[in-house]
């Protein structure tokens, strides 16, 4: 099948994009990127109905590509490289010399460069200092931006969200999951989600308690130097689960009844 994505738009929510890369250009040298919303840049013009970040249009990107200093016109970058890699695989153009072509090499490209999560959220969830981390509110706003952009351009839209989390029940009932589901049910909308990529990280554990009073111990290894960590326990209704903690030196906490809104502070000698 000679399907190259012509006539559709693929939107990426990620670390940004190297818009100067030739793989994102047409044969005449113009950019295939229809727009970029850089949530980290507060110096430019925000998109309509949004109150932060800077939007750069296809005209501005083409102007930058013709300039001796493109970053003075469109100061968008991808320090991490993940967003550029993802866009290359999904929508990169043909490179005959390298024997490469993206899956949808003629699709229009739209990009949301997500801003990092706020410091208080990173601290609350124990996120490592150098870890790439985004908050759901910015992701939701990015999805809305792509949806409105596709409506404006009258294009079918594929939302590419190659982000992951170890939090939540992974049952499709979180706020973000429901929002993604609502977009996927719209005409001319498709949602692509990255999954897995955990390999042998052992971030998850599943157990089964068959009898009342049955106990199952789980060892949690916390990286040296961490000041805290977050763990979630998920059960099935109507079962009630209790837990206790054993410190590395052997102190054991009282049994904790896990109820909504409960808070406990435990001090070990």
Segments predicted by a language model, with ranges:
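Exoplasmic/lumenal beta-rich domain surfaces
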Residues: 44-58, 254-269
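Subtilisin-like serine protease catalytic core
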Residues: 2-135, 154-155, 188, 226-229, ...
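Non-catalytic, beta-strand-enriched accessory regions in extracellular/secretory proteins
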Residues: 209-223
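Substrate-binding/access-modulating region of protease and related hydrolase catalytic domains
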Residues: 118-209, 225-253, 262-264, 268
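Short Trp-Ser/Thr-centered turn/loop motifs at beta-strand boundaries
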Residues: 215-217, 251-258
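Surface loops and adjacent helix of pleckstrin homology
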Residues: 22, 246-248, 258
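Glycine-rich, phosphate-binding/catalytic loops in enzymes
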Residues: 26-32, 177, 209-211
């Amino acid at each position: 099948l000679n399907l190259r994505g012509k006539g559709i738009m693929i939107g990426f929510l990620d670390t940004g994009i190297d818009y100067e890369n030739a793989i994102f250009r047409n044969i005449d040298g113009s950019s295939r990127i229809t727009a970029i919303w850089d949530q980290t840049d507060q110096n430019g013009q925000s998109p309509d109905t949004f109150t932060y970040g800077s939007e750069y249009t296809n005209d501005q990107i083409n102007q930058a590509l013709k300039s001796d200093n493109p970053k003075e016109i469109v100061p968008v970058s991808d320090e991490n490289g993940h967003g550029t890699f993802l866009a290359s695989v999904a929508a990169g153009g043909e490179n005959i010399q390298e024997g490469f072509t993206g899956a949808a090499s003629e699709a229009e490209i739209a990009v949301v460069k997500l801003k990092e999560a706020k410091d208080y959220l990173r601290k609350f969830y124990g996120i490592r200092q150098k870890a790439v981390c985004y908050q759901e509110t910015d992701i939701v706003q990015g999805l809305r931006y792509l949806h409105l952009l596709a409506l404006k351009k009258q294009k079918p839209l594929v939302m590419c969200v190659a982000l992951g989390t170890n939090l939540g029940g992974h049952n499709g009932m979180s706020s973000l999951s429901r929002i993604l589901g609502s977009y996927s049910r719209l005409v001319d909308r498709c949602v692509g989600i990255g999954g897995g990529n955990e390999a042998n990280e052992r971030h998850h554990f599943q157990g089964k308690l068959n009898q009342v009073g049955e106990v199952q111990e789980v060892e949690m290894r916390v990286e040296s130097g961490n000041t805290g960590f977050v763990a979630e326990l998920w059960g099935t209704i109507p079962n009630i689960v209790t837990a206790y903690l054993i410190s590395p030196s052997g102190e054991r906490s009282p049994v904790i009844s896990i109820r909504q809104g409960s808070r406990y502070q435990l001090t070990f000698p």
